[in-house]
Amino acid sequence: MAVEFKKIEGDSIQYFALVIILAAVTALGFYAYVLDHKMGLNGLSNRVPWGIVNAGIPYFIGLSAGSLIVSALAGVFNIKKYKVFSRIAAYMAAAWIIAAILSIALDIGKLYHFMNAVRYFNPTSIFSWNAFLYSSYFVICSIYLLVQFEEMEKATRFMAGLAVFWAVLVHSGTGAIYSFVYSKELYHSALTPPMFIVCAITSGLGLLLANLYFTFRFTKRELDPKLIRGLALIFAGLMMVLGYFLAVEGLEKGYIPALHEAVQFVFLTPTSGVFWSFWLLVIFGIAIPIIIVLNPKTGYDLRWITFAGILHAALVFAERFYLIIPGQVFPEEYLPGYELESLHTLEGYIVSYTPSVFEWLQVIGLIAMVYLIFVVGVKLFALIPERAVEEVVEE
C-alpha cells in the first residue's frame, strides 16, 4: 500500500497561537542580535572570540545531517517502512541548515562578507571549503525534497545517496575546523570528525523522534509505536558509539604528559563550567537516554522515548560548548618546558567565558525560527503521512 502524504488544515486557534509565539521568539532573537552587534552585549573577548552562538553552528549542522540521514534510510538502505518519515526529516534538515547558515551570518556581522569566500577562495583553508559545502548542502536538501514531492523514485534514490554522502562530508568538514588546529591542545584530535558525524546522527534522530511524536499527536494521525521503537534502538546504539568515542578521546589526551593540566581542567575541575558541560552530557545526555530506550518498561512508551530524544539533543549542545570553549579559555604553551614570569596580556592564564542573555536569545531565536518554518511548512506542503504504520509501505 502506497504512503499518502497530506497537508494539515491549520485553521485552529491553537495553530495560529503557536505560529505567533514562534514568530515572536524568532523576532526577539534577531532583536537581541541587533543589540549585541551595536553594543557588544556578550561575554566574548580577545581570548574567546567563539562563544555560544558559534557553538550553535556545528549543533545546527549536526541536527540537519542527522535528520537527512534518517530521511535517506528508505532510499539508500532500502528500509521501506521508514519512507513515511522521509519528507518530514528532509524538510527539517533543510530548516536546520538555514539556522546554521544564519548563525554564521550573525557571527560574520556583515552579510556581504559572504562574498569573500568566493572572491578570496583559499584551497588550503577548511573555512573556504566549508562555505562551498554548506551552501551546496542546502541545495541538495531542497532538490531531494522536491523529487520526493514529485514521486520520482529513481531520482529520489540517487538524491538520497548523494544527500547522505554530502551530509557526512559537511559534518566531517565542520569537525575538521577544530581537529586541524594543531596549536590548540584541546582541539587537535583525529577523532573529532567521525565523532561529529555520530553526534550529528544521534542528536538529529533524538530531536526527530520528539518532533514525530508531537506532530502526529497534535494532528491526530496514527503513529505506529513499532516504527518509533525501531528508530529508538538505532538511536541507543549510536549513543553507545558516541560514548565510546568520548572515552577514547579523553583517555588519549589523558595519556599525553604535556596535556595533563588541560585534561585536569576539563574533566576534574568542578568549579569550571566546561567540567559540567562534559559530565552532564555523559550522564544525562548519553547514559540516561540509553537506559530509557533499553528498559522494557519505558522503551516502548512513545512519551519516554520522546523525553530521551529531547534530553540527548539538548545536552549535545553542551557537548558543542565543551568542544569549542575549553580550547580557547585554556592557555597555549608558547615555550614548552619554560615558565613565563612576566605577561602583559591574558595569554598564559585560564580565562573565563559566561554567555550573556543576549547570546542565549540569539540561539533560542534561531531554534524558534526552525520550528516556525516547520509549523508553516506542514500547512503549505504535504509532509506528513495520513498514517504511519509498518504495513503502509511502497511495494
Swiss-Prot record:
Keyword check for ATP-binding: no
UniProt subcellular location: Cell membrane
Matches recorded under InterPro entries: Electron_transfer_protein, NrfD-like
Keywords (A to Z) from UniProt: Cell membrane, Electron transport, Membrane, Oxidoreductase, Transmembrane, Transmembrane helix, Transport
A GO CC annotation given for this chain: plasma membrane
Topology in membrane: Multi-pass membrane protein
Keyword Ion transport applies: no
Top-rank lineage group of the source organism: Archaea
Molecular functions per Gene Ontology: oxidoreductase activity
Pfam families: NrfD
Gene3D superfamilies documented for this protein: Formate dehydrogenase/DMSO reductase domain
Transmembrane intervals: 15-35, 57-77, 88-108, 126-146, 158-178, 196-216, 231-251, 274-294, 305-325, 364-384
UniProt family annotation: Belongs to the NrfD family.
Function, as annotated: Has menaquinol-oxidizing activity. HmeB subunit may function as a menaquinol-oxidizing site. HmeA, HmeB and HmeE subunits may together catalyze electron transfer from menaquinol to cytochrome c.
Quaternary structure annotation from Swiss-Prot or TrEMBL: Consists of five subunits: an integral membrane subunit, a cytochrome b-like subunit, a cytochrome c subunit and two iron-sulfur subunits.
Protein name per UniProt: Hdr-like menaquinol oxidoreductase integral membrane subunit
Gene: hmeB
